[in-house]
Amino acid sequence: MTTLTNQKPLGVLFMAYGGPENLGEMPGYLADIRAGRVTSQAILDEITNNYRLIGGKSPLPEFTRAQVEATMEQLASTGRPLKAYIGMRHWSPWIEDAVREMLDDGIEQAIAIVLAPQYSSLSVAKYQKKIKAALEMNHGHIDFAYIDNYHTEPGYITALADRVRIGIQEFPEDERDDVHVILSAHSLPVRIIKEGDPYADQLHETARLVAAQAGLTDEQWSWSYQSAGRSPEPWLGPQLDEHLRDLNEQGIKKVVSIAIGFVSDHVEILFDIDIAAQEVAHELGMTLVRPPALNTDPLFIGTLASVIERKAAEVA
């Protein structure tokens, strides 16, 4: 790795969505996601039950901590003192608290990265706005360098392509030519496309690179969104359950499902794919395989370290 000569500590703020670490935190967590809007008892009960079915908590905070620890280990040889901070958008440890801690520690320069490879005004930009608001609230200044996206990084693409192969290999060798791969990501409102948001384009670029590296033909894979919100406005589709039904009508019975927009296990994988999508597949007589999420995969951790190191060199 490049040796950086500036010895002033450089902060590295890792940001993720956040998630409840027990069922008792669900009301507050949902209230934050819904910006204080009242959550009906029916919705609260439904989502609480979803979390109960995946173990009674979100594994995202734990995986985020592990990802940060592994990334910082790789960055230890950069030559410049680095200090990691974790901030969540919708639950503790809050982004605002992380920024306050950075100010208290005397951090003057920092890198901010969201654990989401594709940029959107409704995702990554929201995290960055929280940083700026926290600085204003605390009347402080930190020179932040933002990593907006890393959706085409070779290590990230290779790690996902490896998961395609892992999923296909779950099927008997004589059936693998019949396996169809679904690549998916969290849906967002359709209006972002009209506003020129790059989210969908970046997802499709990632998907094409993954499919090519995995050696898939155009007929062997397709794209789907998942986990659409509950607002009445149109959301990007098709949704995963609808897509499974469409594939079934085409005679496809063996499927590998990989959520390329998520970098760790959480409810949108463990419930939306492992439970909800599996129920649809079972109903249709399909076999659905979901390979492991990236979590602390060395290739993905190497990707995070690489993009952070490059950004650190820019601000040195």
UniProtKB/Swiss-Prot annotation:
It is found in: Cytoplasm. It holds the Pfam family Ferrochelatase. Catalyzes the ferrous insertion into protoporphyrin IX. Belongs to the ferrochelatase family. GO terms for molecular function: ferrochelatase activity; metal ion binding. PANTHER family: FERROCHELATASE (PTHR11108), FERROCHELATASE, MITOCHONDRIAL (PTHR11108:SF1). It comes from the Bacteria. Keywords: Cytoplasm, Heme biosynthesis, Iron, Lyase, Metal-binding, Porphyrin biosynthesis. It comes from Deinococcus radiodurans (strain ATCC 13939 / DSM 20539 / JCM 16871 / CCUG 27074 / LMG 4051 / NBRC 15346 / NCIMB 9279 / VKM B-1422 / R1). One of its GO terms (cellular component) is cytoplasm. It catalyses: heme b + 2 H(+) = protoporphyrin IX + Fe(2+). The gene is hemH. Pathway: Porphyrin-containing compound metabolism; protoheme biosynthesis; protoheme from protoporphyrin-IX: step 1/1. Its EC number is 4.98.1.1. NCBIfam families: hemH (TIGR00109). This is Ferrochelatase. It is an enzyme of class 4 (lyase). SUPFAM superfamilies: Chelatase.
